Amino acid sequence: MAISQPVIYTVSRLNNVVRLLLEQEMGLVWLTAEISNLVQHSSGHWYFTLKDQQAQIRAAMFKGQNRRVSFRPQNGQQILVQGQLSLYEARGDYQLIVEKMQPAGDGLLQMKLEALKARLMAEGLFDPRRKRALPTQPKQIGIITSPTGAAIHDMLTILARRDPALPVILYPSAVQGESAVPALLNALETAWRRNECDLLIIGRGGGSLEDLWCFNDELVVRAIANSPIPIVSAVGHETDVTLSDFAADLRAPTPSAAAELVSRDQQQQLHRLAQYQHRLQQAIQLRLQQHQIAWQQQYARLNTQNPRYQLQQKIQKQDELQFRLERVMTQTLVQANQQWMSQHQRLQQVSPKRQLPNLQKQHAYLYQRLLNAMQSKQQDSAQTLSRLSGQLHALSPLQVLARGYSVTTNAKGELIHSSQQVTTGEMLNVQLHQGTLKVRTEEVKSEN
């Protein structure tokens, strides 16, 4: 029976195997301890010892991770860290490679926060499919925050600058301390009950994790997620993230950013009004061109037909088209005036006064141009119609009769063009300019 040979390690190989076992088996661990022997190396890496009353462990935190630490650790400070157990192979030192570091108090809150976040996320409370689109043009917005904080001042300043006509209702609430949670819930319920806003902003300025904790409270988070009114969460600075941000329909990095997101820019409104005015002018011009083409087509048909009856029909048709044109132009002008008046009233609320007279002058100028164009077109049409009627009258068969000519027909009403169509003794009708003669043929002569 063969005897298995023992595995013989080198020191470096053994340390490597132990390091891999530690990293693979233990994974990431959370550790609360006192920091000591802190060395901040010129390379940017930190080396220190973590200890309690009975034991200690070496630790290292590299530059890429310690740059995200929000405080300066001190020897003797109680901290909470998350890291990977490992082994420094060159010396065989068992150590912790730290990835996250927080003061012990904030660290416990952070652990509590992560646990609640995971539970609510598992319930689907933060599912993006639950989120609603914000109204593009809110009629009235509500703000839930402290009435004395910097956040409300910043938001009101931005809203007044961007959209001074947008009504804002403040639902005052504490945003820090033990009274904050019931106050926030009461403010939300008040906004829902009164139902006077179609968009809510909830938030405050920056602070520590403990200061912002009311926005991580489960009752507040659930209330925001189930709000019947769309909510924008605007808590703290851009780096501050609360569970309210995940539950809201939209997260704004700061209260000021929230005010920017929900308001309409006054300059954009003026630009949109100018676009509407340009489109109206184009529509009126197109309608004029269409009716001008229709009139020209009718004119061409009239010009190819000579009898008076057809002329009368075309005149009536022309009158009808002219009436329809006037009615359409009147309706278009009324609609244009109504639309302008509506935009004018809104502009009075949001536009600087010095811009309003210019818009009024421009409107009056365009309005007068439109009236002048209509009157000129109507006069041209009347003159053209009068000229055509005179031409048709001059070419009428009745005018030929007035010059001494006559029209002869037989008893069947057939026109007589040649003596060969007539027999001796046949009765004929002679149409004069004034009156009709009935004659009998005495003699028929043919001209060679």
Swiss-Prot record:
Signal peptide limits: none
Reactions performed catalytically: Exonucleolytic cleavage in either 5'- to 3'- or 3'- to 5'-direction to yield nucleoside 5'-phosphates
Gene Ontology annotations for the cellular component aspect, listed alphabetically: cytoplasm; exodeoxyribonuclease VII complex
Listed Pfam families: Exonuc_VII_L (PF02601), tRNA_anti_2 (PF13742)
Compartmental location: Cytoplasm
InterPro entries named among the record's database cross-references: Exonuc_VII_L (IPR003753), Exonuc_VII_lsu_C (IPR020579), OB-fold_nuc-bd_dom (IPR025824)
GO biological process: DNA catabolic process
NCBIfam families: xseA
Function recorded in the entry: Bidirectionally degrades single-stranded DNA into large acid-insoluble oligonucleotides, which are then degraded further into small acid-soluble oligonucleotides.
The protein's name: Exodeoxyribonuclease 7 large subunit
Organism placement in taxonomy: Bacteria, Pseudomonadati, Pseudomonadota, Gammaproteobacteria, Aeromonadales
